[in-house]
Swiss-Prot record:
Enzyme class per UniProt: transferase
Keywords, ordered alphabetically: Glycosyltransferase, Transferase
Alphabetized HAMAP family for the sequence: Nucleos_phosphorylase_PpnP
Gene3D superfamilies referenced in this protein's UniProt entry, alphabetically: Jelly Rolls
Matching PANTHER family: PYRIMIDINE/PURINE NUCLEOSIDE PHOSPHORYLASE (PTHR36540), PYRIMIDINE_PURINE NUCLEOSIDE PHOSPHORYLASE (PTHR36540:SF1)
GO CC aspect terms: cytosol
Function: Catalyzes the phosphorolysis of diverse nucleosides, yielding D-ribose 1-phosphate and the respective free bases. Can use uridine, adenosine, guanosine, cytidine, thymidine, inosine and xanthosine as substrates. Also catalyzes the reverse reactions.
InterPro entries registered for this protein in UniProt: Ppnp, RmlC-like_jellyroll, RmlC_Cupin_sf
Official protein name in the record: Pyrimidine/purine nucleoside phosphorylase
Keyword set includes Ion transport: no
Length: 94
């Protein structure tokens, strides 16, 4: 079953799905600044575009481009700066 999610007044949209017990979402973020909280550990992969992120326990910002991934701890948060519309895959690691 697919689950459609919408955040930040429609500027971030994703479709959640499950495959062989693994949960993931694929989505698109419009240009903007966002902050997400995590319940479980996540791996974010940039499909097209770029995401500049700051993890909750870090001072520095890092940019990830097409094909690159970063992990976010569970019960944490991360900030994003998106300069152009960007597609992503979010895999839940629990």
């Amino acid at each position: 079953m697919l689950k459609v999610n919408e955040y930040f007044d429609g500027n971030v949209k994703s479709i959640g799905f499950e495959q062989k017990g693994d949960k993931a979402t694929v989505g698109v973020m419009e240009a903007g600044h966002y902050q997400f909280n995590t319940a479980a550990p996540e791996r974010m992969t940039v499909v097209k575009g770029a995401l500049t992120i700051q993890l909750a326990d870090e001072d520095e910002w890092h940019t990830y481009e097409q094909g690159q991934s970063f992990d976010v701890a569970g019960h944490s948060s991360f900030k994003l700066e998106v300069k152009t519309p960007t597609a992503y895959l979010c895999e839940f690691l629990d």
